[in-house]
Protein backbone atom coordinates (compact mmCIF):
# COMPACT_ATOMS: atom_id res chain seq x y z
CA UNK A 1 0.00 0.00 0.00
CA UNK A 2 2.73 2.47 0.88
CA UNK A 3 4.50 1.92 -2.45
CA UNK A 4 1.29 3.09 -4.14
CA UNK A 5 1.06 6.11 -1.82
CA UNK A 6 4.66 7.06 -2.57
CA UNK A 7 4.13 6.58 -6.32
CA UNK A 8 1.09 8.85 -6.22
CA UNK A 9 2.99 11.50 -4.27
CA UNK A 10 5.94 11.28 -6.68
CA UNK A 11 3.50 11.85 -9.56
CA UNK A 12 2.28 15.04 -7.88
CA UNK A 13 -0.92 13.88 -6.22
CA UNK A 14 -1.89 14.91 -2.68
CA UNK A 15 -2.61 11.92 -0.44
CA UNK A 16 -4.59 12.19 2.79
CA UNK A 17 -6.62 10.14 5.26
CA UNK A 18 -10.34 10.81 5.72
CA UNK A 19 -11.61 8.40 8.37
CA UNK A 20 -14.55 7.86 10.66
CA UNK A 21 -12.15 6.67 13.35
CA UNK A 22 -11.42 9.23 16.07
CA UNK A 23 -8.50 11.42 14.97
CA UNK A 24 -6.26 10.48 17.92
CA UNK A 25 -6.77 6.76 17.27
CA UNK A 26 -6.07 7.14 13.55
CA UNK A 27 -2.94 9.18 14.33
CA UNK A 28 -1.75 6.51 16.78
CA UNK A 29 -2.39 3.67 14.34
CA UNK A 30 -0.60 5.37 11.45
CA UNK A 31 2.27 6.49 13.68
CA UNK A 32 2.80 2.99 15.05
CA UNK A 33 2.88 1.70 11.49
CA UNK A 34 5.47 4.37 10.72
CA UNK A 35 3.43 5.91 7.91
CA UNK A 36 1.73 8.98 9.42
CA UNK A 37 4.13 11.42 7.75
CA UNK A 38 3.35 9.98 4.31
CA UNK A 39 -0.05 11.69 4.33
CA UNK A 40 -0.54 15.41 3.81
CA UNK A 41 -3.54 15.54 6.13
CA UNK A 42 -5.62 13.35 8.37
CA UNK A 43 -9.20 14.20 9.31
CA UNK A 44 -10.97 11.93 11.77
CA UNK A 45 -14.56 11.47 12.88
CA UNK A 46 -14.13 14.04 15.65
CA UNK A 47 -11.95 16.56 13.81
CA UNK A 48 -14.94 18.41 12.38
CA UNK A 49 -18.55 18.82 13.43
CA UNK A 50 -19.50 16.41 10.62
CA UNK A 51 -18.17 13.08 9.36
CA UNK A 52 -18.59 10.69 6.44
CA UNK A 53 -20.87 10.30 4.57
CA UNK A 54 -21.15 14.11 4.70
CA UNK A 55 -19.09 15.17 1.66
CA UNK A 56 -17.63 18.13 3.55
CA UNK A 57 -15.55 15.65 5.56
CA UNK A 58 -13.84 14.57 2.33
CA UNK A 59 -13.64 18.10 0.93
CA UNK A 60 -11.99 19.47 4.09
CA UNK A 61 -9.52 16.58 4.06
CA UNK A 62 -8.57 17.48 0.48
CA UNK A 63 -8.20 21.16 1.36
CA UNK A 64 -6.01 20.40 4.39
CA UNK A 65 -3.75 18.33 2.15
CA UNK A 66 -3.44 21.26 -0.24
CA UNK A 67 -5.63 19.65 -2.89
CA UNK A 68 -8.67 20.68 -4.87
CA UNK A 69 -11.84 19.01 -3.53
CA UNK A 70 -13.32 18.98 -7.03
CA UNK A 71 -10.38 16.91 -8.28
CA UNK A 72 -10.19 14.25 -5.58
CA UNK A 73 -11.27 10.66 -5.38
CA UNK A 74 -11.97 8.41 -2.45
CA UNK A 75 -10.35 5.04 -1.84
CA UNK A 76 -12.26 3.06 0.75
CA UNK A 77 -13.56 -0.23 2.03
CA UNK A 78 -17.10 0.40 3.26
CA UNK A 79 -20.58 1.34 2.13
CA UNK A 80 -20.08 4.65 3.95
CA UNK A 81 -17.10 5.38 1.71
CA UNK A 82 -19.23 4.74 -1.37
CA UNK A 83 -21.98 7.01 -0.03
CA UNK A 84 -19.43 9.73 0.72
CA UNK A 85 -17.99 9.67 -2.79
CA UNK A 86 -21.47 9.73 -4.32
CA UNK A 87 -22.51 12.68 -2.13
CA UNK A 88 -19.28 14.48 -3.04
CA UNK A 89 -19.64 13.78 -6.75
CA UNK A 90 -16.15 12.28 -6.95
CA UNK A 91 -14.92 8.90 -8.19
CA UNK A 92 -14.85 6.01 -5.73
CA UNK A 93 -12.33 3.18 -5.61
CA UNK A 94 -13.26 0.35 -3.26
CA UNK A 95 -10.84 -2.36 -2.18
CA UNK A 96 -11.85 -5.98 -2.66
CA UNK A 97 -9.70 -7.11 0.26
CA UNK A 98 -11.19 -5.01 3.07
CA UNK A 99 -13.67 -6.04 5.77
CA UNK A 100 -16.50 -6.48 3.27
CA UNK A 101 -14.34 -8.14 0.63
CA UNK A 102 -15.95 -9.03 -2.67
CA UNK A 103 -19.26 -7.49 -1.54
CA UNK A 104 -17.77 -4.12 -2.52
CA UNK A 105 -18.44 -4.87 -6.19
CA UNK A 106 -22.19 -4.73 -5.49
CA UNK A 107 -21.78 -1.05 -4.51
CA UNK A 108 -20.72 -0.32 -8.10
CA UNK A 109 -17.60 1.74 -7.42
CA UNK A 110 -15.85 3.48 -10.30
CA UNK A 111 -13.07 0.96 -9.79
CA UNK A 112 -12.57 -2.13 -7.67
CA UNK A 113 -9.02 -2.43 -6.35
CA UNK A 114 -7.61 -5.93 -5.97
CA UNK A 115 -3.98 -4.87 -5.48
CA UNK A 116 -2.57 -1.53 -4.33
CA UNK A 117 0.02 -1.76 -7.12
CA UNK A 118 -2.83 -0.96 -9.54
CA UNK A 119 -3.88 2.21 -7.73
CA UNK A 120 -1.68 4.77 -9.55
CA UNK A 121 -3.02 3.68 -12.95
CA UNK A 122 -6.60 3.73 -11.65
CA UNK A 123 -6.14 7.26 -10.29
CA UNK A 124 -4.84 8.52 -13.64
CA UNK A 125 -7.76 6.85 -15.44
CA UNK A 126 -10.37 8.36 -13.09
CA UNK A 127 -9.08 11.90 -12.49
CA UNK A 128 -6.20 12.39 -14.92
CA UNK A 129 -2.57 13.23 -14.34
CA UNK A 130 -1.64 15.42 -11.38
Which residues does each predicted region cover?
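Asp-based, Mg2+/Mn2+-dependent phosphohydrolase catalytic module
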Residues: 6-10, 22-23, 27-130
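Alpha-helical phosphate/pyrophosphate-handling elements in metalloenzyme active cores
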Residues: 2
Amino acid sequence: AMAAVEALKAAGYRVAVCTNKPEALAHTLLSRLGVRDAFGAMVGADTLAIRKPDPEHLFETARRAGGDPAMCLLVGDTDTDRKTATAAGVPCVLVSFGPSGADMAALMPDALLDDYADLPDIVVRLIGAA
